[in-house]
């Protein structure tokens, strides 16, 4: 089963994330609110049996929040869903094909000019720093390390470490199965 981890500093976006999740394939969705600027206080958004919400202060880019959520996971596959994104519909087509013995990467639909022109595809075939985005991988919990809490590039370092330790367990799925910052894309 799949555990989704969302570090959250934009609670207004959570309903859109919720609407993109197929809970049939999800064991738990862990939402970790960044309470750095709220004196440790947060207001939970959902009352759902598969959703757990809690708060953590400090760090950058949601990294301490991801680590705290990983403390709650014991097994299964893990997917990191940022609070400025939603899950791509194709994601739910690949999830039933996944095996706990491997970590997976896939392609991403971009809205910026990072890979060329807006709308181009960012390949997920290179799980290395600055070659992949957080939304482009699913990993078994037992392969997970911790996120560097004070490093903006922690997502790339996290997956690169997994890749370096488990190269023979990497499967690249050459399909678009995620977006890049979908909720921040330009709209016309």
Regions found by a protein language model. Give the residues of each.
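Hydrophobic targeting segments
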Residues: 2-6, 21, 27-31
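Short, well-formed alpha-helical segments that are part of the catalytic scaffolds
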Residues: 10-23
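Short beta-strand/loop segment that forms part of the nucleotide-sugar
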Residues: 26-38, 52-57
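Glycine-rich, basic loop-to-helix element that forms the pyrophosphate-binding segment
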Residues: 57-72
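Short beta-strand-to-loop acidic/aromatic patch adjacent to the donor-nucleotide binding site
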Residues: 75-86
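Conserved catalytic core of nucleotide-sugar-dependent glycosyltransferases
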Residues: 88-153
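Active-site donor/metal-binding and catalytic loop motifs
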Residues: 110-114, 135-136, 173-188
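A short, conserved alpha-helix in the catalytic core of glycosyltransferases
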Residues: 152-168, 173-174
